[in-house]
Design a protein with these regions (language model features):
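Short, basic and Ser/Thr-rich N-terminal targeting/leader segments
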Residues: 16-18, 86
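A short beta-strand micro-motif
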Residues: 20-25
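Short intrinsically disordered, low-complexity coil segments enriched in acidic
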Residues: 1-2, 58
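Short, flexible N-terminal segments of the mature chain
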Residues: 31-56
Length: 95
């Protein structure tokens, strides 16, 4: 099976569009506070930031964003991380 990333994921004759985003949640209530689409960041760049296991090469699983990841994401996104108030993660959804 051949995997490719273009505007979607091509699997055989089927194309599944996916969207990656940074989501953040209030620490006090765990309520979703915001989302930012990050589809402009190359998949290889995201892999180097989050180092997924071999079973998740396409970053389908959510990944926590801590200080280290925030610093590496900073050149790519316009978001001020406030770790005292929010938790952050990279998410992937079918679009």
């Amino acid at each position: 099976m051949r995997w490719q990333q273009r505007k979607g994921l091509e699997i055989g004759l089927f194309t599944m569009k996916i969207q990656r985003m940074v989501s953040w949640f209030r620490l006090d209530t765990e309520a979703l506070a915001g989302e930012l689409v990050v589809d402009h960041i190359p998949l290889d760049t995201l892999r180097s930031i989050f180092t997924p296991p071999p079973t998740d090469e396409l970053l389908y699983n959510p990944y926590d964003i801590q200080q280290r990841e925030a610093l590496l994401l900073a050149p790519w996104i316009d978001l001020r991380f406030e770790f005292a108030a929010y938790s952050y993660q990279l998410d992937c959804f079918q679009a």
